[in-house]
Design a protein with these regions (language model features):
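Membrane-proximal basic amphipathic "stem/tether" segments
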Residues: 1-20
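Active-site and donor-binding regions of nucleotide-sugar-utilizing enzymes
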Residues: 18-24, 30-136, 262-265, 280-283, ...
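Structural motif
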Residues: 30-33, 189, 272
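Active-site regions of enzymes building and remodeling cell-envelope glycoconjugates
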Residues: 78-95, 237-254, 289-291, 308-326
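A nucleotide-sugar donor-handling region in carbohydrate enzymes
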Residues: 113-195
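Acidic donor-binding loop of glycosyltransferase active sites
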Residues: 268-274
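Nucleotide-sugar donor-binding patch of glycosyltransferase catalytic domains
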Residues: 281-342
């Protein structure tokens, strides 16, 4: 295969995936579970959902068969894909989730290592439990399973498609309505969520920077803090935000089953989003909202393709702006000026 072209190699490596998807499409009466999905928000927005959009573009019949499973009320993220959506958080408590499914949060730093073929795996006990929850909810005798491991193995080859074609898998989303959550939002505001992660550790210096940044921003526009009342992912606790004037909290409107739905609705209405570099920062551009995310430790960013991919597709003219910067050598005032000028 020494002389094999990149296109030929991608086609060869995608062949088992296509064969499995074609089999699923032929079984028209059997629902296809897209999942079990319990990965991080960033992987869902940047990889999983675009992969599913590729799937239905290549196999249109699967659109009618897909059953989307996720958590936190993110059905709107799958706009144009979903006819049936099952939210795990309507079936389990937070304690049950941690005890039974917490290990699902572990992700790889890069999707290059995943080569699992469709239909070729034994499911863990936790995965089997989720598959059974979905099967019962949709009332099916059995499900075909489109497992995320298929996406990790195939995505790098899908990403090799022409840039314009690949960007089509990141369409503009309809901004979700804020009605129904009991929210009282300012007419104009900035949505803020900072949480601990590898790029932005919760050091004293970083927390001080964030506190000053929020204070400076709040002098001009109200701040809506997206911190959640429950610690769903203990690896990424929220930075505390001072309860100062012009800072609005929305924890009273959040439940386990709707926390991401609430955050999505608020981000869609915000003048801008400001937060840690990571998963949630990928969402605002899909609503044509500017996103500003910060990091202090760039070492983790250099090990993956995530940032390069986000910058290449989320800053497209049809979407909102996507800005990522290091707080090293910057001042809170400089960041605030950039946000307020957007």
């Amino acid at each position: 295969m020494r002389d094999e072209s990149e296109d030929a190699r991608s086609a060869r490596l995608l062949a088992p995936v296509r064969e499995a998807l074609a089999r699923f499409e032929q079984e028209t009466t059997v629902p296809v579970l897209a999942g079990p999905w319990l990965g991080e928000v960033g992987f869902e927005l940047l990889y999983w959902i675009p992969f599913l959009r590729w799937v239905v573009s290549e196999f249109p019949g699967l659109r009618r068969q897909l059953v989307i499973q996720s958590r936190g009320g993110v059905e709107s993220w799958y706009e144009g894909l979903v006819t049936r959506y099952v939210d795990l958080f309507t079936h389990v408590t937070l304690r049950e989730f941690r005890e039974r499914f917490g290990k699902f949060f572990k992700q790889t730093d890069t999707y290059d290592g995943y080569t699992q073929a469709a239909g070729g795996r034994d499911y863990s006990e936790a995965e089997q439990a989720i598959i059974e929850i979905v099967r019962r909810e949709v009332g099916a005798e059995r499900l075909n399973v489109l497992h995320p491991s298929v996406m990790y193995g195939a995505f790098k080859h899908i990403q090799g498609s022409p840039e314009r074609a690949f960007a089509a898998y990141f369409p503009e989303l309809t901004r979700p309505p804020v009605s129904g959550f009991g929210l009282e939002l300012p007419e104009q505001f900035i949505a803020v969520r900072f949480y601990e992660c590898f790029p932005l550790p919760a050091s004293e210096a970083n927390q001080a920077f964030v506190r000053e940044l929020v204070t400076v921003l709040a002098d001009t526009l109200p701040i809506v803090c997206l911190n959640t009342p429950m610690s769903i992912d203990r690896k990424h606790p929220d930075f505390p935000i001072d309860r100062i004037e012009s800072v609005v909290t929305v924890q009273q409107s959040m439940t386990l089953a709707n926390n991401l739905a609430v955050q999505s609705a608020i981000i869609g209405q915000a003048n801008a989003f400001v937060g840690s570099y990571g998963g949630l920062s990928y969402l605002p551009p899909l609503y044509r909202r500017p996103s500003f995310s910060l990091y202090s430790d760039g070492r983790s960013l250099s090990k993956t393709n995530h940032l390069a991919l986000a910058q290449s597709v989320l800053g497209k003219p049809k979407l909102g702006s996507y800005w990522v910067g290091s707080i090293e050598g910057m001042t809170p005032r400089a960041v605030a000026d950039a946000v307020l000028a957007s």
